[in-house]
A protein has these predicted regions:
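Signal peptide-directed extracytoplasmic domains
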Residues: 1-4, 27
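Substrate-binding clefts and substrate-entry loops adjacent to catalytic sites
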Residues: 4-16, 44
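Penicillin-recognizing serine hydrolase domain
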Residues: 20-173
C-alpha cells in the first residue's frame, strides 16, 4: 500500500512498525537524507503530504530513488504493475494493488526502451509529481518531475512530460 498504489495510512503504519513512532521514522528519513547529501531536503512526516517545513527538490529525490533502487525488494515493488495480496477474511480473493504509473502505460510510449517503474504523487501545493525509472537504448535513467499542472482528475501531465523526456533521450545519438 505504500507504493502500490499509494497510501498515506500505509506509510504511517510502516513508520510505526519500523521505528515505534512516526517521529522516530522521520528522524531516520532525515538521517538518510543527510547520508545521501540531499542538502535541500527536510522531512516532517513519512507520507510526503504538505507541511510547512517538509520540502525537497527533484535532484534530491533522484538521489534517494537511485539509492533505493539498489535494494532488490524496493526495485521489484517499484517496477511492478500489479500485485495481489494474500487472501484475508475481508478479501478472500486477495487485494489487487496497481501501480499508478504503469497502469496508465501500454508499452508503446517509445520504441527503443520502456518505462520500468515509477511513483506518482499529488498534493495541491506540490502539483502532479513523478519519480520514474526507464531504460532507453539499453541504459537506465531516473527522472523526477515536480509541480506539473493538473490534479488526479485531469490529464496526467507529469506522465506525459516523462514520456517526452524519455523519447528525446531515445533520439539522442
Amino acid at each position: 500500500g505504500t507504493l502500490l498504489p499509494s497510501g498515506a495510512e500505509c506509510c504511517e503504519a510502516l513508520a510505526r512498525e519500523v521505528s515505534g513512532s512516526e517521529e522516530a521514522f522521520v528522524a531516520l528519513m532525515n538521517q538518510k537524507a543527510a547520508e545521501l547529501e540531499m542538502q535541500n531536503t527536510h522531512f516532517c512526516n513519512p507520507t510526503g503530504l504538505t507541511e510547512l517545513e517538509h520540502y525537497s527538490t527533484a535532484a534530491d529525490l533522484a538521489k534517494l530513488l537511485q539509492a533505493a533502487l539498489q535494494n532488490p525488494t524496493f526495485r521489484t515493488i517499484f517496477t511492478t504493475e500489479t500485485y495481489t495480496s494474500s487472501a484475508t477474511a475481508q478479501h478472500p480473493e486477495g487485494l489487487l494493488l496497481v501501480s499508478t504509473l504503469l497502469s496508465r502505460l501500454d508499452g508503446t510510449e517509445f520504441s527503443d526502451g520502456a518505462i520500468l517503474g515509477g511513483k506518482t504523487g499529488y498534493t495541491k501545493a506540490a502539483g502532479l509529481c513523478l519519480a520514474s525509472l526507464a531504460v532507453v537504448r539499453g541504459k537506465e535513467y531516473i527522472l523526477v518531475t515536480l509541480g506539473a499542472p493538473g490534479s488526479h482528475a485531469t490529464v496526467q501531465t507529469n506522465i506525459q512530460d516523462a514520456i517526452q523526456v524519455y523519447r528525446r533521450l531515445q533520439k539522442k545519438k
